[in-house]
């Protein structure tokens, strides 16, 4: 009887130890484009993949992008409304009904990203052209981003101003 009890107890212990290990998300380490890809290219790919898998909640999308292995800073997200937005000077950005800004917790990294859900009043391409025409890569006084990128999937627009590679 003691052997059966000991065997049962050890099996329960093994089961408890192995059952507590959670699965890691497959999407948190997406760096598919290649070793020489820029940070913007990596995030565009990640965005397209997540959006094509049905992720439409902007905050969840932004947090997923910040979890990408290519990002080497602690990031934060915050909702934005149509109007004046950081990185676009005095241009009022309209044409969306939901928006999320994401970027580093400490702004010494020249990175800022936005996700916009378009409201249907503007064409996707025209909205992205307006963003690119008004974006200022030196929005942050001490640093400047190297590139900007815009991408669209299912009425959601990603816009990023970033260094070529994380850590620069």
Name each model-derived stretch.
Residues 1-4, 8-11:
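Positively charged n-region of N-terminal signal peptides that target proteins for export
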């Amino acid at each position: 009887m003691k052997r059966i009890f000991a065997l049962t107890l050890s099996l329960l212990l093994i089961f408890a130890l192995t059952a507590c290990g959670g699965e890691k998300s497959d999407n948190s380490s997406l760096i598919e484009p290649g070793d020489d890809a820029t940070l913007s290219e990596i995030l565009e790919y990640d965005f397209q993949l997540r959006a094509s898998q049905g992720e439409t909640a902007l905050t969840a999308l932004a947090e997923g992008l910040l979890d990408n292995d290519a990002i080497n800073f602690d990031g934060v997200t915050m909702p934005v409304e149509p109007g004046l937005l950081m990185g676009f000077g005095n241009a009022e950005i309209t044409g969306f009904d939901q928006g999320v800004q994401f970027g580093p917790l400490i702004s010494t990294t020249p990175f800022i990203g936005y996700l916009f859900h378009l409201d249907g009043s503007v064409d996707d391409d025209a909205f992205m052209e307006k963003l690119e025409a008004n974006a200022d890569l030196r929005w942050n006084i001490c640093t400047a981003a190297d590139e900007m990128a815009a991408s669209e999937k299912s009425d959601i627009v990603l816009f990023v101003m970033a260094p070529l590679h994380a850590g620069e």
